[in-house]
């Protein structure tokens, strides 16, 4: 996507052929910074501390982390050690483990002398595959927006609620939940996006709103608790979110608060869609509530908020009393029964084992 007059991916290989650059998302929307990752420790920090975030982008970043590791030490022991180190950074996003497995399975049969170059080649392929998957997701989701738009009066926008950031900043490009929105805008379909702020890290306010601004998409930032009210009053035509892990039966694990949006959507007959590339599907898990590990993040993310101060500096301020404990589960699980459809690169699946296997028969 474009930032100013330049087209960016969220991650790219440097001219030295070894280090990678990323957009450091901790500073958005106030500052646009690019940082270089040169070591596995850099990559682990970037994933764990959310310099990069979003399940697809985490996976691609980890793939490049393996490549960086192979350039230093291509042994089996180092390959396994790096797999373990990076896999522990974010436990919920399945794309992380998928990418690490893809890299290890590709590299293991190769002679050690060939592994470094092969690793960078495979990581670049995973990055490009992500772009193509998201483009296909966008085309399939666009059909849903077109259908809703066809029932509107001329010029009346399709009103879309989204939660967290499943935009191009969460992937290499296009995004998952935002890809259909961007394609609708490019096609001339009027849309208006309601952006949940998404506490506690405010990815909606910081990132999705920044994306919408940059792409010229009409949007309104709302507090997390306003979505149900808007649905009650007929102000939302559809909800579309991303996912960090989707089970074989169609349960969806996404940013905390997604489940409440799905409940409100069901109560108000608002279609609730989830956009995802197939590497986000965990075919080994059936019951998302019981089986998916939920990352617990630091209490400081709840007790403090970051923003731009009056003097222009970026400041973090406490918003809760000293000594008040805070819980910070990063994700929740939305049961398949609350989901209208799963928008994948192969089409829109009904959220069920049968629906997913119809699109992915190789998993039967």
Swiss-Prot record:
NCBIfam families: eIF-2B_rel, PRK05720.1, salvage_mtnA. It catalyses: 5-(methylsulfanyl)-alpha-D-ribose 1-phosphate = 5-(methylsulfanyl)-D-ribulose 1-phosphate. HAMAP family: Salvage_MtnA. Belongs to the eIF-2B alpha/beta/delta subunits family. MtnA subfamily. One of its GO terms (biological process) is L-methionine salvage from methylthioadenosine. Substrate binds at residues 53-55, 90, 203, 254-255. InterPro entries: IF-2B-related, IF-M1Pi, IF_2B-like_C, Initiation_fac_2B_a/b/d, M1Pi_N, NagB/RpiA_transferase-like. This is Methylthioribose-1-phosphate isomerase. It comes from Brucella anthropi (strain ATCC 49188 / DSM 6882 / CCUG 24695 / JCM 21032 / LMG 3331 / NBRC 15819 / NCTC 12168 / Alc 37). The lineage of its organism: Bacteria, Pseudomonadati, Pseudomonadota, Alphaproteobacteria, Hyphomicrobiales. Signal peptide: none annotated. One of its GO terms (molecular function) is S-methyl-5-thioribose-1-phosphate isomerase activity. The active site is at residue 244.
